[in-house]
């Protein structure tokens, strides 16, 4: 089955499938939950929509158990806001904070969250330090999610970069006057270890669920760190792929999950 046909079947939109081959990278949109979702044609934006919004719950790229029932969510690496609006649909009573340092992504993120009052977005990255840092751009001009804080993440040196603002994650939490983060989604192209290990442990002790993608930078050190804080870990990794998804849940939440849910992790 061709990629275009898969996109058509899931989206029920001929225009969405056709946009896979629209190399002009125009801003287009698709209806989801009776709201418009904006994206750049023929880019990784469309992959995000397909893998997160258009898949059944247990096959979506990220899995967030309803049993978590979060009040506060951090979407770290917000990209164009696809995960944020997915989280808003799952947890309409939660307050969602989305952080995206790339201005080009952020402009589309703002358009996508305009219909969701429980999402607040920030055009910054999170990390252990405050400052402006280089973010290297993918050599694949259609991949707007393949940025990296590291110039040589895969053995193919990245030449192009932009400078983006990064804020210390603990400073941001204090500024927002938060005393807990119930759920964290993180996909920061290799900065996951730096971000989560710099987060004050008192917050992670109160966090019920962390879900994200890891990129080959101290990944298993991070998972071991989370395990030491009381998280149980599940991961889905292919032996020849440095990228993989993971879920980390506190035992109190996992004990509430059904057998079907646990098998899907």
Language model regions located:
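Phosphate/nucleotide-binding beta-alpha loop and adjacent structural elements of enzyme active sites
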Residues: 1-265
């Amino acid at each position: 089955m061709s990629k275009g046909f898969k996109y058509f079947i899931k989206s029920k939109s001929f225009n969405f499938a056709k946009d896979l081959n629209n190399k002009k990278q125009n801003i287009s949109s698709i209806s989801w939950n009776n709201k418009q979702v904006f994206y750049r044609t023929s880019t990784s934006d469309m992959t995000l929509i397909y893998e997160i919004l258009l898949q059944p719950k247990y096959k979506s790229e990220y899995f967030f158990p309803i049993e978590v029932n979060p009040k506060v969510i951090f979407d770290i690496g917000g990209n164009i806001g696809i995960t944020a609006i997915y989280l808003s649909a799952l947890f309409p009573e939660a307050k969602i904070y989305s952080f995206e340092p790339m201005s080009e992504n952020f402009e589309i993120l703002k358009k996508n969250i305009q219909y969701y009052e429980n999402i607040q977005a920030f055009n910054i990255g999170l990390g252990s330090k405050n400052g402006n840092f280089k973010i290297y751009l993918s050599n694949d001009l259609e991949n707007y999610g393949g940025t990296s804080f590291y110039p040589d993440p895969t053995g193919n040196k990245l030449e192009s970069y932009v400078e983006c603002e990064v804020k210390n994650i603990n400073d941001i939490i204090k500024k927002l006057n938060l005393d807990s983060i119930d759920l964290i989604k993180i996909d920061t192209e290799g900065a996951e270890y730096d971000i989560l290990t710099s987060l004050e442990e008192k917050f992670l002790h109160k966090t019920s669920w962390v879900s994200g993608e890891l990129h080959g930078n101290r990944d298993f050190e991070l998972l071991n760190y989370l395990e030491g804080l009381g998280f149980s870990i599940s991961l889905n990794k292919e032996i020849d792929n440095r990228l993989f998804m993971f879920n980390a849940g506190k035992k109190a939440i996992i004990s509430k999950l059904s057998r079907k849910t646990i098998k899907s992790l």
